[in-house]
Amino acid sequence: MEKTITIYTDGACSGNPGKGGWGALLMYGNTRKEISGYDPATTNNRMEMMAAIRALEALKEPCRVELYSDSAYLVNAMNQGWLKRWLKNGWKTASKKPVENIDLWQEIVKLTTLHRVTFHKVKGHSDNQYNNRCDELARLAIKEQS
């Protein structure tokens, strides 16, 4: 039987572009795993995406995933058909410009083929303890490298 994993993710940037960090919380039953990382020169959107990528990569087998993010960029691309249109249009936006962060979108395509992922938008910097913890992990990753 396929496991259902709950994942919360967040990215942060000190300057945009600037130093960035990402954090993720993976939960299955009573088990929790926290992961985070750092990039010395990045953007907030890239860190939001990297959090989702690294969390999905951490799964040891194909799973059903409920992924929660405060990134409208990430969630809308997945839920409003942006990603499908970009693929259909050869990685071009509706205005015929190249899609930004194509390298990370290609990773997300691979990972969402392996796992059955449902993306959920949560309000950032609010009362969601899991999203707040991911924000803390992302900011700590920046602080520890600075």
UniProtKB/Swiss-Prot annotation:
Binds 1 Mg(2+) ion per subunit. May bind a second metal ion at a regulatory site, or after substrate binding. It catalyses: Endonucleolytic cleavage to 5'-phosphomonoester. Residues 1-143 form the RNase H type-1 domain. It is an enzyme of class 3 (hydrolase). Its EC number is 3.1.26.4. GO terms for molecular function: magnesium ion binding; nucleic acid binding; RNA-DNA hybrid ribonuclease activity. The keyword DNA repair does not apply. Mg(2+) 1 binds at D10, E48, D70. SUPFAM superfamilies: Ribonuclease H-like. GO terms for biological process: DNA replication, removal of RNA primer. Its cofactor is Mg(2+). Mg(2+) 2 binds at D10, D135. Keywords: Cytoplasm, Endonuclease, Hydrolase, Magnesium, Metal-binding, Nuclease. It is found in: Cytoplasm. One of its GO terms (cellular component) is cytoplasm. Its main location: cytoplasm. Endonuclease that specifically degrades the RNA of RNA-DNA hybrids. Belongs to the RNase H family. NCBIfam families: PRK00203.1 (NF001236). Monomer. This is Ribonuclease H. It comes from Chlorobaculum parvum (strain DSM 263 / NCIMB 8327).
